[in-house]
Amino acid sequence: MNTEMSLGRYLVDVAATLADLEKRNVVQRIWQKDHTVWKPDPTEITNRLGWLAVTDRMQEEIAGLEAFSKEVRDAGFQYIVLLGMGGSSLGPEVLRQTFGKRDGYPELLVLDSIDPDWIKQVQDRIDPVQTLFLVASKSGTTIEPNLLYEHFRSVVESVVEPQAAGGHFVAITDPGSTLVERAGKEGFRKVFENPSDIGGRYSVLSFFGLVPGALAGEDIAALLRKADQMKQTCTIDSATDNPGCQLGAVMGVMALNGRDKLTLIASPGVNRFGLWVEQLIAESTGKEGKGIVPVAGEPLVDSQYYGDDRLFVYLRLNGDDNNEVDAAIRAITDSGQPVVTIEMQDKYDLGAEFFRWEFAVPVAGSLLGSNPFDQPDVQKAKEATKKVLQVHKETGSFPAIETGGSLVALMEVAKPGSYVSIMAYMVESDETNTLISEFRRKLIERYGIATTFGYGPRVLH
C-alpha cells in the first residue's frame, strides 16, 4: 500500500516531529510497552497494549474459528445477530457493510441500538429458530447489550424448548466478566474469552471482530495476514519509514496547528471504515480539553467551503469507482489543504488499515499529551445514565428536557473552527441518511464548518 502526502507548509513541522520521535525512540518504547510515552502513571496504559500482539494471538485461533463457523452452518443457523455497543460492534459493522453477505453463510446483522423501531426491524427480519445471537461486551456490564440479550432470550424461549434456548447464544467478553458467569449458568453455546489487555476500540482484530467475521464467511486469515504485514512495518525504528508513526505524526502536528478536524474520505467500497475509525480517534484523543475531531461520511462539496481547520485523509481502493472522489481530492489538494492519500489494493487491506490507525492514534496522542487508552467521558456518560434511570425508578418519569432556540440562532454563534454534531436517536434508514447528508451539505456550504453525524446511543460509546 502506497501513501502520498501533500502537506504544504506543514511538511517542515512534520519532518521535525518525525525526527524528534525517532530521537526519543518512541517506536521502540511503544513496542516495549513503556507507559511514559504518554503519562508518568501506568494506570490504564500498560494493561491496554495487548493489541500490539493481537495478530500473533489470533492467527493461532483461525482454525478454531473456522471450525466453529462450520458448526454453526451445520446447525442450520441462517442469521447471526451481534448485540453490542461501541468497540464491540463498530468493527463488525464495518466488515458487514464492506464484504456483504456470502453465499452459503448466515447473514450477519449488527444491533447496537435500543431504539424500539430498530429492534423491531431486526426482529422482523429474522427467524429466531434459525438465529444465533452474539452477546459482545468486554466488561459484561454494558447496559444496552444486556438489555438486548434479555429481550431476545425471551423471544427465543417463546419458539424453542427452554433447555435449547441457550444454544442460540454466544458470548464474547473478557475472562472473569459477569457475562462469562451468566453464559455458564444460562447454557450459552460457546464463550470466547478475549485477551483482557485489549481495550474495546482496539479490539477489531481480536475475537470481537473475528468471531462475527468468521461466522459470516469472511476470510479472516487474509484479514489477519494483511494486519500482520502492517504490524511488521510498524516495528521499523525509523519514524519516517514507519507508516503508523508517520500518520500519527501528521495527525498530531496538524491538530497542534489548529487542523484538528480529521476528515476521512473513502472510495465507495470502503466508505464505512469511518464508522470504526471515528470512535478510535475521538475516544482516544478527546480528553483533557484537547483532541482530534473525526469527520466521516460528509458529502463532498466544492473545496472553497472547507475551513483551515481540516486535515484530509483519502482511503482509496484501487479498481473502485473513484472518478468523483478523485476529482474532489484533486480540487481539495489544489486549494492548499493538507491531504494524505492511502492506496488499498483490495478490501482485505482493511486489516492493515485497522492496525495502522491503531498505531497512529497513540502516536498522535503522545504528541497531544493525552492517554489514548482511557475513556473518562464514557464512564461519566454511563454514570449519568444510571442517575437518570434511578430518577425514573423513583418518580416514574424522566427529567424534563430543556430545548434550545432555533437552529439558525445556534449557528449564528458558530465561530471558525467550530463543528456541528448531529445525533439521531432513531432507526437507521436510507431515507434518513440521505436527508442528513443533504443537511450536512447545506451547513458546510453556508457556514464553512465541519459536521459529524451518528446514531444514538451508538454515539455515546
Language model regions located:
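Glycine-rich phosphate-binding loops that contact phosphosugars or nucleotide phosphates
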Residues: 70-237, 311, 315-320, 326-336, ...
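Phosphate-binding beta-loop-alpha motif at adenosine-nucleotide cofactor sites
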Residues: 268, 342-348
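Extended, charge-enriched "interface" segments that sit outside catalytic cores
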Residues: 1-73, 319, 327-328, 336, ...
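Active-site phosphate/pyrophosphate-binding segments
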Residues: 158-313, 352, 356-450, 454, ...
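Short, charged beta->alpha transition segments
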Residues: 67-68, 116-125, 248-251, 406-412
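Catalytic nucleophile loop
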Residues: 83, 454-456
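Conserved catalytic block of serine-dependent lipid acyl chemistry
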Residues: 325, 460
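Conserved phosphate-coordination/catalytic loops
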Residues: 59-63, 113, 241-245
